[in-house]
Each structure stands twice: as structure tokens, then as C-alpha cells.
């Protein structure tokens, strides 16, 4: 669970801050938005692992954003927990009917929130982390540690393999070099951030002309793995 990214959408800064402190202490990375417009931009750019979404927001409501996200094939799988002062059963049912995965009524304790969040992530997480991952003709098999491209073995080093595995399991999301170092090399290893660039070049070379463009440079941020040009 640790290392997951949570988007907190609430128009009240003190509530966002309280939630962020509790989640960061539990090992999560937090993103924040104060309205649905900001939230949608963050979701498209970072694709968080879970969204904590306040019901009452200025402009477009949280429930409307949840409805929109669950209609979009790129965001339908992101779990949503609704946050609200509304405790009536009808409101809970409405939230769950649009696709929210859970519902928590204010005020709540940080411990309760973290426990509910962990439960939702367990329920909605990938069922089999050892299943092969396929993007077009690019296939990564976590059990044999083999990569094939259009049925032919791809030669790459162990670091490039780990980098590709991380990218393929975290698609359509931009990562900084520092985040990639933490996720692929490990937080206790001291490596220059530019080392990431070297291994990205090697990975692209191993993927060849057809698939090298899946590993995209995000100017001012770092890299992402995306099937969209």
C-alpha cells in the first residue's frame, strides 16, 4: 500500500491539510485540489491510485465529478471515497450508485479514514500481480522476467527490466526522476538523478523503433509510459 498516490479534493484547506498529514504519516503521497476543475487536471496528469472526493464543492459538485470519472474508460478504475457532512441514507445510496467505492461522513478520525482507504485499495487493487502485462505486441512476464516484442525476446538489463515493469504497471502517469529512483532503485540507494536518463535511453533502445515512443519525456517533470502520442 505504501507509495500509493491519493488525490484529496476538498474546498476547505484545513481539511485537506489534516487529511494530507494523516496520509503522509501512513506512507502515502498526497495531491490536492480545491474544486472539480483542478481535480480533473490533476487526475489527467497524475492518475492517482485513489480519490478522496468531497460531496459539496463550489461549481460542479463532487458527485458530478464522480459520475464523469466513472464514464471515462481512462479513469473508471480509479477508486473513489466520498467525503461529506451529509449522513442521510439517500445521499449515501446516490454516491454509491454513481460508482463511489466507499463513503465517509464528516467529522471522521484520521485513523478511521486511513483504515477505510486501505480497505478500498485492497478491494480494488489488481487481483494478480504475477499476470503477464501486455501493451500491443509488447509483453512482460513477471514470473519468468522475460520481455517479448511481437513474439521475439527483447534483450535488456535488470535495471531496464525493473523500469519497464514499473512503467507498465503505472501507465499514463508522469513521474519525476526522483520518484523513479525511489520506486525502481529503492529509497536507500544513492544514485544521481541523471542515471535515470541513461537507463531510459537504454530501455528505449531495447524497445526498438516501434515501441520506444511508449516511454515519453514530460518536459519539466520527468517521464511517463503512455500509449497516447
From Swiss-Prot:
Subcellular location(s) per record: Cytoplasm
Keyword presence, Cytoplasm: yes
Molecular functions per Gene Ontology: phosphorelay response regulator activity; transcription cis-regulatory region binding
A GO BP annotation: positive regulation of DNA-templated transcription
Phenotype on disruption: Loss of swarming in the presence and absence of phosphate; double phoB-pstS deletions act like phoB deletions.
CDD domains with a match to the protein in the record: REC_OmpR_PhoB, trans_reg_C
Domain Response regulatory: start-end pairs: 5-121
Disulfide-bond pairs as recorded: none
Keywords associated with the record: Activator, Cytoplasm, DNA-binding, Phosphate transport, Phosphoprotein, Transcription, Transcription regulation, Transport, Two-component regulatory system
Superkingdom field: Bacteria
CC terms in the record's Gene Ontology section: cytosol; protein-DNA complex
DNA-binding region as annotated in the record: 130-227
Main localization category: cytoplasm
Pfam families from the UniProt entry: Response_reg, Trans_reg_C
Residues with the 4-aspartylphosphate modification: 54
UniProt-listed PANTHER family: PHOSPHATE REGULON TRANSCRIPTIONAL REGULATORY PROTEIN PHOB (PTHR48111:SF40), REGULATOR OF RPOS (PTHR48111)
Annotated protein name in UniProt: Phosphate regulon transcriptional regulatory protein PhoB
Organism: Pseudomonas aeruginosa (strain ATCC 15692 / DSM 22644 / CIP 104116 / JCM 14847 / LMG 12228 / 1C / PRS 101 / PAO1)
Amino acid at each position: 500500500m505504501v507509495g500509493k498516490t491519493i488525490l484529496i479534493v476538498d474546498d476547505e484547506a484545513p481539511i485537506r491539510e489534516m487529511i494530507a498529514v494523516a496520509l503522509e504519516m501512513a506512507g502515502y503521497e498526497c495531491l490536492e485540489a480545491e474544486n472539480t476543475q483542478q481535480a480533473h487536471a490533476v487526475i489527467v496528469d497524475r492518475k492517482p491510485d485513489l480519490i478522496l472526493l468531497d460531496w459539496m464543492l463550489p461549481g460542479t459538485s463532487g458527485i458530478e465529478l464522480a459520475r464523469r470519472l466513472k464514464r471515462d474508460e481512462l479513469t473508471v478504475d480509479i477508486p473513489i471515497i466520498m467525503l461529506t457532512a451529509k449522513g442521510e441514507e439517500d445521499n449515501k445510496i446516490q454516491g454509491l450508485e454513481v460508482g463511489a467505492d466507499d463513503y465517509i461522513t464528516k467529522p471522521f478520525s484520521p485513523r478511521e479514514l486511513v483504515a477505510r482507504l486501505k480497505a478500498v485499495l485492497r478491494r480494488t487493487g489488481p487481483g494478480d500481480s504475477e499476470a503477464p502485462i501486455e501493451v500491443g505486441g509488447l509483453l512482460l512476464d513477471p514470473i519468468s522476467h522475460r520481455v517479448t516484442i511481437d513474439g521475439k525476446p527483447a534483450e535488456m538489463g535488470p535495471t531496464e527490466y525493473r523500469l519497464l515493469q514499473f512503467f507498465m504497471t503505472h501507465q499514463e502517469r508522469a513521474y519525476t526522476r526522483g520518484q523513479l529512483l525511489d520506486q525502481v532503485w529503492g529509497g536507500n540507494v544513492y544514485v544521481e538523478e541523471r542515471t535515470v536518463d541513461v537507463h531510459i535511453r537504454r530501455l528505449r533502445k531495447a524497445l526498438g523503433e516501434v515501441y520506444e515512443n511508449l516511454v515519453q519525456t514530460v518536459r519539466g517533470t520527468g517521464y511517463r509510459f503512455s500509449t497516447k502520442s
